């Protein structure tokens, strides 16, 4: 069993570069199946989710070369075969294969997706959109069968009942090679959606409105190869900004797009965090006094649900009482009992997280229950006095590229141990 050992209480300094966006690349890789030639992605993060996606692509017949942060995929050999259940079940973003396989073959046999357990994340919105485009859905054991019964998937006017990044991207990808026009209303607006649309348009798609709540896709017959730069990971950037404010004595975070983090930065400024925003970087100063605030997550451009857990350790340094309300994922509270083990004055009351600061954290044995909870525990371990041991670290490695090396370069006493 692998674990992370941290000897905390040491102020960090230096510079850390943000990697490419996990939430983009997990959708970009499956979308490449639609291309008729080689596609190259630059800025691909070295995370285990990427390794899993590469393995799935190779099992399906794609030729893949991955060197440094450059990923080259030739999808011409991809075959219409049932997808490997084991890998699919471990990867929530595997549902992005639905849209790309439907767009290319008009059918798909896939296992139901896995990933972090954050409460209900139904794929009903995806399936409702596919059905509007002529797809029939059936189930056999642990597999889901999607088929157009030999017909070409067709365009449709689709209204998303709730704002969903995954359903918006999946529908957009499927519609790219559909017959006719597709309109998605109440679409999600996240930067990762724009990134996927940019890749597809560079491959020859006709997509307008990505980043707004109405996206229009005019189907095309062929998509060609291209080269694409993955956007920076705004969640990784936010994690390091919060970490820098919590335990830093001057840290510069580079490869940052400020416009993707405006709501997050605004809440930090409300706390009293001192920082300087540069063209593609943010310098976080050593902090003095901070005040407690209330966080309420909402769809982009609101406060990202993926950032409420990584921010929590910093909130524990603030003076006063505050609350965290996650309106997106109701079970995103699993980091709370782990932080309590470390001495945090924090609890869950009526589905809301309530904290009283400042809390003095001490090292403890804790368990990462999901990706962003794991990030919170790493920051808490760096803040705490003494030794912190984090288990279940596979969640952390799913989404944070080279996290041990990056933190070590800032001066952290942190190790990944193989038991």
From Swiss-Prot:
It is found in: Cytoplasm. It holds the Pfam family EPSP_synthase. Pathway: Cell wall biogenesis; peptidoglycan biosynthesis. The active site is at residue 116. Keywords: Cell cycle, Cell division, Cell shape, Cell wall biogenesis/degradation, Cytoplasm, Peptidoglycan synthesis, Pyruvate, Transferase. The modification 2-(S-cysteinyl)pyruvic acid O-phosphothioketal is found at residue 116. Its EC number is 2.5.1.7. It is an enzyme of class 2 (transferase). InterPro entries: Enolpyruvate_Tfrase_dom, Enolpyruvate_Tfrase_sf, MurA_subfamily, RNA3'P_cycl/enolpyr_Trfase_a/b, UDP_GlcNAc_COvinyl_MurA. Phosphoenolpyruvate binds at residues 22-23. It catalyses: phosphoenolpyruvate + UDP-N-acetyl-alpha-D-glucosamine = UDP-N-acetyl-3-O-(1-carboxyvinyl)-alpha-D-glucosamine + phosphate. UDP-N-acetyl-alpha-D-glucosamine binds at residues 92, 121-125, 306, 328. GO terms for biological process: cell division; cell wall organization; peptidoglycan biosynthetic process; regulation of cell shape; UDP-N-acetylgalactosamine biosynthetic process. One of its GO terms (molecular function) is UDP-N-acetylglucosamine 1-carboxyvinyltransferase activity. One of its GO terms (cellular component) is cytoplasm. It comes from the Bacteria. Cell wall formation. Adds enolpyruvyl to UDP-N-acetylglucosamine. Belongs to the EPSP synthase family. MurA subfamily. This is UDP-N-acetylglucosamine 1-carboxyvinyltransferase 2. The gene is murA2.
